[in-house]
Design a protein with these regions (language model features):
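Generic hydrophobic/packing signal
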Residues: 56-61, 70, 79, 93-96, ...
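PAPS-dependent sulfotransferases, especially Golgi type II membrane carbohydrate sulfotransferases
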Residues: 2-52, 265, 270, 278-329, ...
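Charged/polar interaction segments and conserved charged motifs
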Residues: 1-15, 112, 116-146, 231-261, ...
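A short, structured active-site edge motif that brings together acidic residues
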Residues: 81-85, 249-252, 358-362
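PAPS-dependent sulfotransferase catalytic core
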Residues: 2-201, 365-372, 413
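PAPS-dependent sulfotransferase catalytic domain
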Residues: 153-357
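Small/flexible residues
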Residues: 61, 77, 89, 135, ...
């Protein structure tokens, strides 16, 4: 479901980005429904009355939590993470040395970014809407295949006729394996690297419809693990006047870094940046995966990089949360073991009220963004490797573990 985000080329990202922008603007202004065109011409993402932001480290369980919450009938949401829209606007590496965006960074087209962030937002409603899903498929295609000139109007007609996207992609020589909702088997080789957004996992669930003017009274649910490094910037530059509540989702270090280790070693869309040559023990790929923390390294052990990603993300959330008045810390372990009560706590925190559609989803949540079948304490399959990294960890790791209250290994499910 929530497409990881970006793969940006170090060599010529501007050419690729400009091509994606051109095709996206064409779709936004000429291909999607007139109703959606009207919304995007008059409104921006900061026009919502309230925002619920999920902040966590990668492989922290945010995709599952996001998918549950976006089924609440008083919410709106994107179809996945919003990193791709920041990348389209050049607000990413290599413009920055890492995923950290300074709170005072203002050198970007704010109006355009806020409009772009609204481009695929839909409303949770049981009946859903086919045109919404078709429009969202179209606005994402230039980000996913920016170096291809596709007949977007014809693609839209075929989608509305009921032709599957798989069939349409095959017609243009694009393996469906490279797109959303593909088979669980891993690709034999990495996907095309010239993308703004990686294809897998992004989808609009069937209970979403297009935005109307009245929907801005609802709560917008957002999540992207990269937000861990830009919370003050989000508060000051994107939503300075919006009621923003933050859910800090935590997960024990062993399970998180084990999930990261799995994801790095799969050709399944977790690649994010071309940072140059990588010499990481345990990794044979050529692209960086997941978030790019400050102090990232290109040499060493992959398991240590995974630990760094967990530590740095949560350290920055702990530091950046002071920019917000309302922050709720939630354990992913509780989302798994006491789903109903934990979701109820979040719903009350966000002032959302009851939702029959949400209740149904809580009882039978979707399986999203998994690298392997979910299983408690799966990290113990490579316990020696994981603990070797934890034993080498520095003082910052110890401080984060203590602040997040993960000092008892018996609780690391």
């Amino acid at each position: 479901m929530g497409g990881w985000g970006v793969v940006s080329l170090e060599e010529a990202p501007d050419d690729l980005r400009n091509q994606a922008k051109r095709n996206y603007e064409h779709i936004k202004n000429e291909v999607i429904t007139e109703e959606k065109q009207s919304i995007l011409s008059k409104y921006q993402v900061n026009d919502f009355d309230s925002v619920l932001l999920i902040a966590t480290a990668p492989r922290g369980g945010s995709s599952l939590l996001f998918d549950i919450l976006r089924h609440h009938e008083e919410t709106c949401s994107l179809d996945g993470e919003h990193d791709r829209w920041l990348t389209l606007n050049g607000i990413c590496y290599p413009a920055f040395e890492s995923d950290v965006i300074p709170a005072d960074f203002e050198s970007f087209d704010r109006e355009k970014l806020l409009t772009d962030l609204l481009a695929e937002v839909g409303v949770a409603e049981r009946s859903g809407g086919r045109t919404h899903r078709v429009d969202n498929t179209l606005v994402r295609l230039p980000l996913q295949f920016p170096n291809r000139e596709l007949p977007y109007k014809r693609i839209r007609e075929k989608l509305l006729e009921g032709v599957s996207l798989d069939e349409i992609l095959k017609e243009f020589g694009i393996p469906p394996l490279q797109y959303d909702e593909y088979s669980e088997q891993d690709a034999n080789s990495p996907f095309e690297t010239e993308t703004i957004e990686d294809r897998p996992f992004v989808s609009s669930h069937s209970h979403k419809r297009s935005l109307t003017v009245d929907d801005f009274k609802r709560t917008l649910v957002l999540k992207a693990s990269g937000d861990a490094y830009r919370l003050p910037w989000i508060r000051e530059q994107l939503f300075p006047e919006t009621d923003v509540k933050v859910v800090h989702l935590t997960r024990n270090p062993a399970a998180s870094i084990n999930g990261l280790y799995d994801g790095w070693r799969l050709n399944r869309g977790f690649q994010t940046y071309n940072v140059g040559d990588l010499d990481l023990e345990g990794y044979s790929g050529s692209l960086w995966c997941y978030d790019l923390p400050p102090g990232w390294v290109s040499e060493g052990k992959l398991i240590d990089v995974c630990l760094m990603q967990w530590v740095q993300a949560h350290r920055h959330i702990l530091d950046g949360r002071v920019a917000f008045d309302d922050v709720l810390r939630v354990r992913f372990e509780d989302v798994l073991t006491d789903t109903s009560s934990t979701i109820k706590e979040i719903i009350e925190f966000a002032d959302l009220g009851e939702s029959a559609l949400l209740t149904e989803n809580v009882k039978n949540p979707n399986k999203v963004m998994t690298t392997k079948d979910p299983r408690h304490a799966r990290w113990r399959d490579r316990e020696d490797l994981v603990k070797s990294a934890l034993n080498r960890a520095d003082k910052t790791y110890t401080e984060v573990v203590e602040k997040l209250e993960y000092t008892e290994e018996s609780e690391w499910i």
